[in-house]
């Protein structure tokens, strides 16, 4: 009976969640609502949250899916308190399986690893063991990583390379024949305001408030760290966004562009071969990490990022005619990728991958332009054709 209720609830929730394509539309997701929907209040779910937050009530909330909240409002009354508790217990156990005993981990992998993700084997034990330190104490681990693997010279080179790529993107904006001067002006303002984070944060996170007790279980200590993180986030309510805060650890092999703060971040983890090598030529570095940086910069002007202004606010700064021209060009790119057969009978979803496809093309173009404008390109182009360069 419990399992049937859990599966039934998941199926109902699944049918009320926006499709992935719709979730790519910022204006469709950002809906300011007042108060908490009635059913949540009727089940006394709001009070403990409000008490923990230290505020009397939610005056406004940015709801990513109002449709989902409306569904919850109508669905909760159909469940008993016992069914709601069973669902929440299952959710906690499922989320905690990674720090529980092997039988919980194995059961979780059978479902979410094999069935949902198609994996054949779980990650090795050492890698799973590093998950919690990397997430809960990410910057502490990152500080150790940076001291050993990321010299200051790497950061200096990268900051210069990023500025060259910023100039190159500015050139491409100027060269757009379909964009008006008014919209180009705002695009340049946004590009100039772009915050760049390279390698590691200037100020490391202070974890001294996390209380680790060796006498307690692994699970209890993980929960204690989670409580600290939650309270740390509560303290940010009602305060200006700290744009110096990092949202990716230094040892992470990845990068990001955040439209809501208009920033790009390249942790030390990705600034190593094959992406970056201080001893390599400019041609190699522009062709590797340069393309990645150009990709992330372009996200600021793709089908999602273009809806945010220089400050990260959701504002339409495009002239209507420019927006219409952009959409027509984007539709053509979407159609092109819809025809890509990724497996027999399986085609790419050009609408869902549109942002990445735009960023990939932008990254290549920007990196090439930046390299050709660099001093090193003159000598390199003597050895290769213009296409090879």
Where are these regions (language model features)?
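Conserved small/polar residues in nucleotide/adenosyl-binding loops
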Residues: 1-2, 6-16, 384-389
């Amino acid at each position: 009976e419990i399992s049937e209720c859990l599966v039934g609830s998941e199926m109902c929730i699944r049918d009320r969640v926006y499709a992935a394509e719709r979730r790519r539309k910022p204006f469709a997701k950002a809906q300011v609502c007042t108060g908490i929907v009635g059913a949540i209040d009727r089940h006394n779910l709001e009070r403990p949250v409000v008490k923990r937050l230290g505020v009397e009530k939610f005056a406004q909330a940015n709801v990513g899916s109002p449709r989902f909240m409306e569904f919850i409002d109508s669905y909760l009354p159909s469940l008993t308190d016992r069914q709601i508790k069973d669902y929440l217990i299952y959710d906690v156990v499922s989320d905690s399986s990674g720090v529980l005993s092997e039988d919980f981990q194995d059961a979780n992998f059978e479902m979410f690893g094999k069935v949902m993700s198609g994996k054949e084997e779980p990650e090795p034990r050492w890698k799973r063991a590093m998950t919690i330190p990397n997430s809960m104490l990410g910057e502490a681990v990152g500080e150790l990583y940076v001291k050993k693997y990321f010299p200051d010279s790497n950061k200096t080179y990268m900051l210069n390379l990023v500025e060259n790529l910023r100039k190159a993107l500015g050139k491409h904006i100027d060269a757009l024949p379909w964009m008006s001067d008014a919209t180009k002006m705002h695009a340049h303002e946004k590009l100039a305001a772009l915050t760049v984070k390279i390698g590691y944060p200037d100020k490391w996170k202070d974890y001294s408030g996390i209380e680790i007790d060796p006498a307690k279980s692994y699970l209890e200590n993980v929960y204690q760290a989670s409580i600290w993180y939650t309270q740390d986030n509560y303290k940010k309510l009602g305060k200006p966004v700290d744009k110096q805060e990092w949202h990716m650890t230094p040892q992470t092999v990845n990068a990001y562009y955040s439209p809501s703060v208009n920033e790009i971040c390249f942790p030390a983890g990705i600034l190593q071969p094959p992406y970056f090598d201080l001893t390599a030529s400019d041609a190699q570095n522009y062709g590797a990490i340069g393309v990645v940086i150009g990709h992330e910069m372009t996200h600021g002007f793709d089908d999602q990022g273009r809806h945010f202004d220089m400050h990260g606010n959701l504002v339409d700064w495009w002239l209507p005619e420019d927006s219409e021209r952009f959409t027509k060009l984007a539709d053509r790119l979407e159609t092109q990728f819809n025809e890509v057969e990724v497996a027999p009978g399986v085609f790419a979803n050009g609408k869902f991958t549109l942002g990445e496809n735009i960023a990939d093309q932008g990254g290549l173009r920007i990196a090439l332009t930046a390299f050709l404008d660099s001093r090193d390109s003159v000598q390199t182009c003597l050895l290769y054709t213009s296409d090879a360069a």
